[in-house]
Amino acid sequence: MTKAASGDSKSTLYCSFCGKSQHEVRKLIAGPTVFICDECVELCMDIIREEHKISFVKSKDGVPTPKEIREVLDDYVIGQDHAKKVLSVAVHNHYKRLNHATKNNDVELGKANILLIGPTGTGKTLLAQTLARIIDVPFTVADATTLTEAGYVGEDVENIILKLLQAADYNVERAQRGIVYIDEVDKISRKSDNPSITRDVSGEGVQQALLKIMEGTVASVPPQGGRKHPQQEFLQVDTTNILFICGGAFAGLEKIISARGQGTSIGFGAKVADPDERRTGEIFRQVEPDDLLRFGLIPEFIGRLPVIATLDDLDEKALVKILTEPKNAFVKQYVRLFEMENVGLTFTEDALMAVARKAIQRKTGARGLRSILEGVLLDTMYELPTYDGVEEVVVNAEVIEGRAQPLIIYAERRDKGGAA
């Protein structure tokens, strides 16, 4: 659509989709009575590419191949190549098993639930969420720390299946092919080596309660949630084909693994092991069932999680990529917020590195990146709507380190100053 700017000899053209003028964009393409800018064209291409990736060319089994699953995971999760490969193969095999369950009964394929082990903020939950989106199945996240044994204050394990059922709009058949992610599973480790001291209702007791639904049982789920009572009607959900992914940071597990691998050596030639010599993620790759047993998981629970995927620590380079590259990257989100005020936002390269360093120092991983950016931009976002003529805000390393305020560039006078 064409709009005339008052006082101009020529009419100014505007994008029919985003409303930006021809002076604000690189290119404006004309069509019959409409115009579209290069930015909107790029956005449309992103949407088409995304839909094309999600609606896969399926393998002959009707399930995305491991490589196709991996390609989509790469769009959302930076790094973690080993974990992506393990998860892609496990999920492909799981849904291939479901599709072939009724075709040939000679060999019964067992369910392979997955255990994700990795430091906090490395992408465990995001990986599970993305997998569910790729396969297009119901997905729910449960917090293991809120679960207790039946009969005690807290959530019953059946509430996990209720959440999955709600995610499937109470379609039982769809829910029975869904994915459940149980977070903080390391927090339900056995609290004491001696089980006779006291009843461990939130540790070993929860592990025992989870065994049946993870292996496969017909769970009686109260539709409204809450505790069961005799007069209540129940929905019957078969958990045999539900894929369970358990995740946790497993703080301290690396010491158990290192102690097993060190052995004993003495003499002048003996190598003295430095605990900081290897990154936590590297040590996790050597995990064995015995290590998880020593950590506090019971043998039966470990047996229900045959596939183990370990995640690596995120270094500075990986954190900078997380800030800028994914479709929903934090920097892109803040740039879009500032665009809504018609203001540009620029982070210098050294600023991004400073954010990454601060996240590593705090040991929060990718989870801490947003809070760092929020703290840095808080004053600017507070004052910005009241400013006139601001064209751009620039953030450098000094701003991230707290030694300066963001640089504010004005459109007309090009004045520079700090945010109040």
Swiss-Prot record:
ATP binds at P119, T120, G121, T122, G123, K124, T125, L126. It comes from Phenylobacterium zucineum (strain HLK1). ATP-dependent specificity component of the Clp protease. It directs the protease to specific substrates. Can perform chaperone functions in the absence of ClpP. Residues 3-56 form the ClpX-type ZB domain. Component of the ClpX-ClpP complex. Forms a hexameric ring that, in the presence of ATP, binds to fourteen ClpP subunits assembled into a disk-like structure with a central cavity, resembling the structure of eukaryotic proteasomes. Pfam families: AAA_2, ClpB_D2-small, zf-C4_ClpX. GO terms for cellular component: HslUV protease complex. HAMAP family: ClpX. CDD domains: RecA-like_ClpX. Keywords: ATP-binding, Chaperone, Metal-binding, Nucleotide-binding, Zinc. This is ATP-dependent Clp protease ATP-binding subunit ClpX. One of its GO terms (biological process) is proteolysis involved in protein catabolic process. GO terms for molecular function: ATP binding; ATP hydrolysis activity; ATP-dependent protein folding chaperone; protein dimerization activity; unfolded protein binding; zinc ion binding. Zn(2+) binds at C15, C18, C37, C40. Belongs to the ClpX chaperone family. It comes from the Bacteria.
